[in-house]
């Protein structure tokens, strides 16, 4: 079970030494939870995938990698962040009724190569063609491929694109997938941002 969401304290020392205490799981699907590892996009741009160890732990908690946490070298951490921002660029373009950036789509498509075993045609010593599978990518790459596949599934479907949202709070930048029957959900969490907004409206009426 994922830990609850945490509000970021105003006095939070940045950059973080580790982002693990500040992950939240309100996106409704792995691709959007991944985008949300960059917190407060409107304000402080808080990076919560600070180290390779952070990313390895996050992939396990997100359910796209099995424990133990996969090893993530620095260059792969950088590539993972690039994938995250590509997904977000496509998401925000859709929400703003703009064409999705070609570069973002190409990058997501690149990661799909790691999402599942790929067929490989080889020759035996006797020259007979044999169909097999290519060597699997490392665990962290496979997990990032799974995130890319989730993003591609969401972005590539008109029905699913219509369910992508950004929290209506002025201070929250969480992206989420609206699974409500009416499709009118406004908040990443009613118990968090929704209640805060409700309390503000109440205070305004009392003033």
Give residue ranges: language-model regions:
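Short helix-coil boundary/hinge micro-motifs
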Residues: 1-166, 173
